[in-house]
Amino acid sequence: MVIAASTLSAETQRIPEEALTQPEMRGAWIATVANIDWPTKAAIGDADLQQKEMITMLDTLQALHFNMIVFQVRPTADALYQSKMEPVSSWLVGKQNGMWTDGTMPYDPLEFTCNEAHKRGIEVHVWLNPYRVTGGGMTKGDIAADHVFYQHPEWFVKYGKQYYFNPGLDEVRQWLNDVVADIVDRYEVDAIHFDDYFYPYRIAGEEFPDAETFAAYPRGFDNIDDWRRNNTNLVIEELHRTIKDRKPWVEFGISPFGVWRNITTDPERGSKTKAGVQNYDDLYADILLWLEMGWIDYVAPQLYWEIGKQVADYEILLNWWSENLYGKKLYVGVAPYRLEPNAEKAAKLKGTAKAWGQPNEICRQIRMNRLNGKCSGCIMYPIHSLMENPLGLKDSLRTTLFREPAETPTTKK
């Protein structure tokens, strides 16, 4: 495959005026695991403070002409919404199925967020992690006693220090479909969203413990890697059907690790990168198949690298993904958290990474997205980094890049 490349620098080309007003996704991830973004630790168990914090974020996004959030509601097989299937999240109330400060469930965070976001013209893409049961410093002892983890221990495996659903089991796929169906049925969400955590990132010297499952349920496969990819393919295909059968207008999006495969691994389809992780080979996520089959509506690769990075160049990857969309939408994940406002730390950055000590790296990437012609917007991770206005990023968005509001590219009902 020939990789498209810009013939002129994104900084030297003029952005067409229409690019500022045409449909463009302008999103931000709101991470709840380990209280990364919301609620803050000060607001754990405090419904009033949680609501105030959410309103502050949404008001800021509205003022900056953002039009989408990706709200994490199931970070560790738990719920930041009212659920009969999984426990109230410890990140919301302090421990799984814990009590609020007043002893009641005073509000439904997902319902509240949908209502308040939609008032402001902001879409809500609901973010779930499919297989992770512990994370963010959790241990087995933090899992609620009535969790499905204890009701069906045969569904779970331990890898490293963490626990996961076993992706090779039909029962696990059904459980995940039931969780998603419950959300789609009961909430006015605009999309279901998964990130890069399918099979977990590899641990050196340790194999994911599913050999017995493979031996018991090979489904015609004789290669465990192909079988694992098929496990992930099956759940994506089934979730697509689960969502669309209920509400055809609700979209299904994936935000994968930024490299599908390196060109040295796959000379015909790989990107000109030298990444240490590859979706297809390490996370068993065949994103291109999902796009080709129409199982997902958009892809938001996490391109958290700078323009010009030798092993994973933002521009090369932007162009690669834009040439492998199969007619679906591309929203690029960008990384405000990598901007370095501390002058002393910025001075220590080496090579192309020096870009993160400059105020314009994210702005350059947004301009490059627009010039690409096939990219329909970006999503920023995480929202708290954006809110901190690193190197004046918020100011640049407000006065220049996001000066005018934009409709979303989302297919409406």
In which residue ranges do the predicted regions lie?
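Hydrophobic faces of well-ordered beta-strands that scaffold small-molecule active sites
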Residues: R26-I30, I69-F71, V124-V126, I192-F194, ...
